[in-house]
Amino acid sequence: MLYIIKPFLQKLRYLLQLLLTQIVGWSAECHGSWFTRIIIKLFILFYKVNMQESLQQDIAFYKTFNAFFIRYLNKNARPINSNPSVIVQPADGIISQLGTIQDHLILQAKKHFYSLEALLAGQTRIINYFRCGNFTTIYLSPRDYHRVHMPCNGVLRQMIYVPGNLFSVNPSMVTHVPNLFARNERVICLFDSNFGLIAQILVGATIVGSIATIWSGTVMPPREKVIKCWHYPKFGDKNAVILLKGQEMGYFKLGSTVINLFRYGRIELCDHLYTNCITRVGLPLGYSNKKI
């Protein structure tokens, strides 16, 4: 009997997560005037959001909750490290894990690992690039700035949408749900760079209304059940998508996680970084083993 009930319960849980996400996403786009302002005020108070960093500090400026959530920061709020040999932190949040990829296994939490194959949806060519390389996982809490930036100069070569679950990605869930990041919906972005091929992966979660990139707009929704791939021209082509270090590359409407993958032998992660340390866009994340 259990083998019949279990798939049904899993499907029901997914549908409830999807329904909740759609309701929250719809609500966050509603133009509610006074109601929207009340929700924003309560959110700021509850999560202790630092509005002094925001480009627009008057909450009356924000016509929807999502407009507030993806607010811009002041121009000088996140200075970008200009050393060309340094890779910078792509998002505000905390480092939930970082370190070396153990052949093909990435640490999710203590005693929990997930595979490159699962995270990268079986894309064999890409998987082999990152074996034994380095990774970082940054969790964006509701209070954080939710625009994601480039860790280095890069030329976009591929974007992959991977359908999946919508588990919460808060620290408690990450500790208890096996293979969480490899099971959740996500958008994988691959860039050629002076540090070799790098991956920047935006992971969806419960109540993440959407994920968007600056070159394609909203990637999800619509939520689909098939893997979708987009390929982009290399450097030198007039249609190449070139992004500079510190430049915005996308955003979350409600919080989630950013995972970065780096090739073996191309970078060293900064010694001062550790699990649960705070990250800020533009601060050093790692550095090249060779002069750039």
Curated annotation (Swiss-Prot):
Its cofactor is pyruvate. InterPro entries: PS_Dcarbxylase, PSD-B, PSD_type1_pro. The modification Pyruvic acid (Ser) is found at S256. Its EC number is 4.1.1.65. The record marks G255, S256 as: Cleavage (non-hydrolytic). It is a peripheral membrane protein. It is an enzyme of class 4 (lyase). GO terms for biological process: phosphatidylethanolamine biosynthetic process. Binds 1 pyruvoyl group covalently per subunit. Keywords: Cell membrane, Decarboxylase, Lipid biosynthesis, Lipid metabolism, Lyase, Membrane, Phospholipid biosynthesis, Phospholipid metabolism, Pyruvate, Zymogen. Is synthesized initially as an inactive proenzyme. Formation of the active enzyme involves a self-maturation process in which the active site pyruvoyl group is generated from an internal serine residue via an autocatalytic post-translational modification. Two non-identical subunits are generated from the proenzyme in this reaction, and the pyruvate is formed at the N-terminus of the alpha chain, which is derived from the carboxyl end of the proenzyme. Pathway: Phospholipid metabolism; phosphatidylethanolamine biosynthesis; phosphatidylethanolamine from CDP-diacylglycerol: step 2/2. The keyword Cell inner membrane does not apply. Catalyzes the formation of phosphatidylethanolamine (PtdEtn) from phosphatidylserine (PtdSer). This is Phosphatidylserine decarboxylase proenzyme.
